[in-house]
Amino acid sequence: MQEKYLPSEIERAGQARWTADQTYRAADASDRPKYYCLSMFPYPSGKLHMGHVRNYTIGDVLARYHALRGFNVMQPMGWDAFGLPAENAAIANGVPPAQWTYANIDHMRTQLQALGFAIDWSRELATCKPDYYRWEQWLFTRLFEKGVIYKKMATVNWDPVDQTVLANEQVIDGRGWRSGALVEKRDIPMYFFRITQYADELLSGLDTLPGWPERVKTMQANWIGKSTGVRLAFPYELDGSQEKLWVFTTRADTLMGVTFVAVAAEHPLAARAAENNPELAAFVAECKQGSVAEADMATMEKKGMDTGFKVTHPLTGEEVPVWVGNYVLMSYGEGAVMAVPAHDERDFGFAKKYDLPIKQVIGVDGETFSLDAWAEWYGDKTRGQCVNSGKYDRLGYEAAVDAIAADLAAKGLGEKKTQFRLRDWGISRQRYWGCPIPIIHCETCGDVPVPAEQLPVVLPEDVVPDGSGNPLNKRADFVNCTCPACGAPARRETDTMDTFVESSWYYARYACPDYADGMLDARADQWLPVDQYIGGIEHAILHLLYARFFHKLMRDEGLVASDEPFANLLTQGMVVADTYYREDAGGKKTWFNPADVETKDGVATLRADGKPVVVGGTEKMSKSKNNGVDPQALIDQYGADTARLFTMFAAPPEQSLEWSDAGVEGAHRFLRRLWKTVYEHVQAGPVVTRAGGALPEPLKALRRQLHQTIQKVGDDIERRKQFNTAIAAVMELMNALAKLDGMDADTRAVRQETLEAVAVLLAPIVPHVGEAIHAELRPGAAMRWPEVDAAALVQDEIELMLQVNGKLRGQIRVAAGADKPAIEAAALASEAVQKYLAGQTPKKVVVVPGRLVNIVA
């Protein structure tokens, strides 16, 4: 064994051995229990960041732990390879997205391998490869024929200069991020998944996932947004015909307080009203600009304009004005909302702004309603009763809703209804670098799905986008085709699928990536569901919801038998670091990497010029704040095991990890000490196996701590997923071992047992060091998770606290099985008690078994 801890040599040798032996290749046929561990696959941006390192180390610890416990473990890796960043890089660098993507994949694969992850690389997949996306095209055609996928007009962000659709995040202050042009809202045809058909099952299925964080389940439940309310109509007359303006409300009890109705800018009533009203037409046009994101709508200034139209209140017959509101989304509900300013905070602010009537129709005993300012109780449906509502006065929420719904139903103007916030999933993207939608447009036959034998529709990989429109439209060899139904000349669909489609089923394809005759084979049911899924909380809603939805689609196609894709979910926190900047006269900030900054006596200065920089606080590592740490530089300096140990020790996995150079140094020091301890032990020669007999108390105490540590580390990793406390327990054990300096046979035997166990306990976290020292301690022996010796946990003696008159005065050690008289005698004989009793006879002795003795003097 070499004396020095040389991580680069140790890690290179270990990785070469794993590759040669195909150590981490998962067996499809095995009599061992399966454990499928999956971390969310990365976008191949070109470089790993510390967030990746943390994510994949968490997964690797769990995978390696279960392998040591005898499980048949699968931990695959792939690449979420389609998407907008590749197009942007292509525009900037003049290279095809495919070339950029494949080069990045090669580089990032090398980086992942350098970290020593126990990945089965034989299952590697990239979503941009035709042998992957052909099967989502196949599923698309199946679902299109069944009506689960359909086509309709949808509103998007349109850049009139670049002639392209923009994602919500590409709209900055109402302008296109690249062209700077004012963005328009435009209606275009798009394909949609009927995810709403599965809304109830997606909601109820959350109750079958005890291994998911409650926070994530709550976020999904809120996103699905099941609500029971009333769908009701406000009648009106238009051009001599009787029409109805429909709205949905969960607060039908406030219907008597409606003072106006607001419609979306895209609503037919708004368009009709704007025909002869230039001012309204301009406002409608303004509403149609900017983002269509719901989050943006929620935070923007609420604006409106009266259309001049009136509708009739369904119960009172009074006229109610119709306004256009920029906060009303056409894609939600009916594109119209009833406004009750007295009992809805948004409506209250809107009514105050435009001087609209506010009518109180809910009262709470002991509270006084005021028009001056909003009060929380105005919207309280639990304590409120109807007031100023005629026959509904004094009714509580449920009774009022029932009565009003019944009266509306009798008039044919309403009914109780369950509604979901969830909307169908629009997957059309006017992008080049994505999975082609397998539809052919024929003038005679309409939209025709591409037959299975003609799949995949292969995306040309030699395209260099220029940022203006979809380049596929300019490729005659791609667009021009023959209708599979009638044989006439036709055009191929040039939209591509939302990249969330690829990431919604990749976990299943890992089970059978080599299967060429279908989307999945029987191996999918062998491996699914995923036993442990790991990823960031930012994916709590969209990705995880879409993957759950896709799993049900595949189940209903007979491809999988299970209902849910991921049995257990761990959402790790961010990696954060200090930020530093300087600000110029114009307010522009220049950010400096923490490695280039020195802090002394509370003052941060730039190493390059010695001048001060502003400390910007701790934030998520990012390019924009220049506060990232390059994992490769960390590996080069300290080794992969140090990087892994620090990221697992610095914080519990679900919390943010604050970067600390001192913490990295500390992790490296621990590994050096561990190596030195093993080296010195091995150099001392072979260890003679203990013949038996009693051990002296210090060795018994160490063995007790060793087996307590084995017990704790197993529980911390498997059940609690608290890797930091597992590492801390091993460190405490090593500190205890360091205090043993004897070289007798018993001491050396216990030291050997302890170091062997430590090698295995740490192997999931620092696999290169763990395997290397285990090989020195037990040459040729396979690594297995150590068993807890129950006998070692039994204590011969226990320590009890000594109190005199309720105050702590010392401790005593007694035999573990000592009875009450023996404990009392030991307590009274102790020097501490004798001192405080000062010759007095105690009035009472109270023994709390296993904890303390209290002597009342």
Curated annotation (Swiss-Prot):
Q: Where is this motif: 'HIGH' region?
A: 42-52
Q: What is its EC number?
A: 6.1.1.4
The record's CDD domains line, in alphabetical order, gives:
Anticodon_Ia_Leu_BEm, LeuRS_core
Tell me the InterPro entries matching this sequence.
aa-tRNA-synth_I_CS, aa-tRNA-synth_Ia, Leu-tRNA-ligase, Leu_tRNA-synth_edit, M/V/L/I-tRNA-synth_anticd-bd, Methionyl/Leucyl_tRNA_Synth, Rossmann-like_a/b/a_fold, tRNAsynth_Ia_anticodon-bd
The UniProt record gives the binding positions of ATP as 623
Q: What is its main location?
A: cytoplasm
Q: Which GO terms describe its cellular component?
A: cytosol
**Reactions accelerated catalytically:** tRNA(Leu) + L-leucine + ATP = L-leucyl-tRNA(Leu) + AMP + diphosphate
Q: Which GO terms describe its molecular function?
A: aminoacyl-tRNA deacylase activity; ATP binding; leucine-tRNA ligase activity
Record's superkingdom? Bacteria
- Gene3D superfamilies, alphabetized: 2.20.28.290, 3.10.20.590, HUPs, Isoleucyl-tRNA Synthetase, Domain 1, Valyl/Leucyl/Isoleucyl-tRNA synthetase, editing domain
Recorded protein name is: Leucine--tRNA ligase
Give the classification, highest ranks.
Bacteria, Pseudomonadati, Pseudomonadota, Betaproteobacteria, Nitrosomonadales
Q: Coding gene?
A: leuS
